[in-house]
Amino acid sequence: MLSNFIKGALASIVFCASVWQVQAAEVIKLAHTANISHVHHEAAQLFAKGVAERTQGKYEVQIYPAGELGDQPALAEQITMSALDMAIVSLGNMAMYDRRLNAMTAPFLFKDYDHAHRVIDSFVMNWMNKGLAQYDAVGLSMFDYGFRQVTTQDIVVNTAEDLKGVKIRVPPSTGLMAAFDALGANTQKIAY
C-alpha cells in the first residue's frame, strides 16, 4: 500500500513538473545578406532584442546573416512561400512580386529626408503592403541609404543631361534601370 502511495506521489510530482516547466520561446527566423558589421545586422540585433524584451521571452528572433539562407531574391521568394519568417531585402527584390513597387526606386522622388519619411511613413507602406498581401508578405519598415549620388570615374555629373551615354552600373531594379535609361545613361546591371 505504501508503494502505491509513493508511485502516485511520484506520478503527481512528474505531472506537476511538466506543467510548470518553462515553455520554449517560439522562434522567428530573420535573414539578411549583409555581413555582421553592416547596419542591417545591427538593426536585426536591435529588433531581436526588442522582440525578446517586449514579449518577455515568448518569441526569439534567430538571425541568419551574410546570405546564410540565400541571396536577396531567394530571401524574397522564401518570404512569399512562407519558408522564412522575416528578411531584410531591397524594395527592388520585392518588386519581382508587385511591379508597381519599382516606382519607389526611381531617383529624384523626394526633396529631403523629412519629405521622404513623411511620404513613406504615411502613404508608401500602406500602398506597398496592399500589393504584397496576395503573396502573404508584409513590409514593416524601410531603410534609407541616404540620397544616392551618381559616381563616375572621369565624368562630372551635375545635371541629368550629363548622364547621356554614360555607363552606369545599377542594382537589378527594373525601376532604377528604367529611370537611368530614360535619362540617357547606358545602364549595366550589377549583382546585388
Residue ranges and their predicted role:
Residues S18-A24:
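Sec/Tat signal peptide C-region and signal peptidase I cleavage site
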Residues K29-L46, A66-D71:
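Extracytoplasmic "Venus flytrap"
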Residues M1-L10, W20:
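Bacterial N-terminal signal peptides that target proteins for export
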Residues K29-A31, Q62, A87, R169:
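Short, well-ordered beta-strand segments
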Residues L46, E53-R54, E60-A87, F110-D112:
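Extracytoplasmic small-molecule ligand-binding "clamshell" domains
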Residues V61-G70, I168-V170, A185-Y192:
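Short beta-strand-to-loop elements that line the ligand-binding cleft
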Residues K49, T80, D85, S90-Q188:
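Contiguous mixed-secondary-structure segments that line small-molecule binding/active-site clefts
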Residues S37-Q62, S122, G175-A178:
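Short, polar/charged alpha-helical segment
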